[in-house]
Design a protein with these regions (language model features):
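Active-site glycine-rich loops that stabilize anionic/oxyanionic intermediates
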Residues: 4-7, 59
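Flexible "cap/lid" loop of the alpha/beta hydrolase fold
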Residues: 70, 77-109
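Conserved alpha/beta-hydrolase catalytic His-Asp/Glu region
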Residues: 95, 110-170
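Short beta-strand/loop motif that positions the catalytic acidic residue
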Residues: 174, 180-182
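Catalytic histidine-centered segment of alpha/beta-hydrolase-like enzymes
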Residues: 208-220, 224
Length: 233
């Protein structure tokens, strides 16, 4: 089970995970050093649980899960991926994204973690969380503050979306059963999931209407339902 950027294994506390599920912190989070690049982090995660055959990932964790499916095309039987992205298509798009991420990296290094978190949480992609109880939002805020500014900066610099290769060609060859979960209000990631379902032979799309990007936080029962299921045919 792979968490999102600024998250942690605690992000999954409200889910009902399978027995013996492992949820490692990702590179740059907690005390885990940042990996040199996207594939290095994929290979680090693959080595942690060489016998695992099921993946659950959210956002950054979903992107890394797609990397695992691409790197080890016959290893996994099933994946449940929330708000996944297969990577940007062109060098130009990746350059633009790296420029955007560089602003966050400078903010982390020059202004510190609390100011970065305030800016990060002000993004429109989290607006659907306004309806959540204040205690839930406060817990998420505290979780983000458990990291270090340098750790998150190095995470963005190594496995941010601008550092991720385009995985579409490799994923089109995947034999894994994949359930893509996405919020109906999260248009960018809904389009990405629709595209992935069109190219991956055993992929299915499930939309949580009236919800946004972080379905793990907003509707954990929806996510748990798919965690409990076996692979689709």
């Amino acid at each position: 089970m792979l968490h999102g950027f600024t998250g942690s294994p605690a992000s999954f506390a409200a889910l009902t995970p399978p027995r013996l599920a492992l949820a490692p912190p990702l590179a740059g989070h907690a005390a885990v050093p940042a990996s040199a690049h996207f594939w290095a982090e994929v290979e680090r995660l693959g080595a942690l649980v060489p016998d695992a055959n099921k993946l659950f990932g959210y956002s950054l964790g979903a992107r890394l899960s797609l990397g695992l499916l691409a790197r080890y095309p016959r290893r996994f039987d099933q994946a449940v991926l929330v708000s996944a992205h297969p990577g940007l298509r062109t060098d130009r798009q990746r350059d633009l994204r790296r420029t955007e991420d560089d602003r966050y990296i400078r903010l982390l290094r020059e202004r510190g973690l609390p100011e970065f978190v305030a800016v990060w949480e002000a993004q429109g992609m989290w607006r659907s969380q306004d309806a959540l109880p204040a205690t839930v939002r406060a817990d998420k805020h505290r979780e983000r503050l458990t990291h270090t500014a340098e750790g998150l900066a190095r995470c963005l610099a190594s496995v941010g979306l601008g550092q991720m290769p385009d995985l579409r060609a490799q994923l089109a060859q995947s034999v894994c059963s994949v359930e893509f979960l996405v919020g109906g209000q999260d248009r960018k990631f809904l389009e990405a999931a629709q595209e992935l379902c069109a190219i991956m032979p055993r992929a299915r799309l499930h939309v949580a209407e009236n919800h946004g990007h972080d379905l793990v936080l907003e509707c954990p029962q929806f996510c748990s339902t798919f965690l409990a299921r076996g692979p689709s045919s």
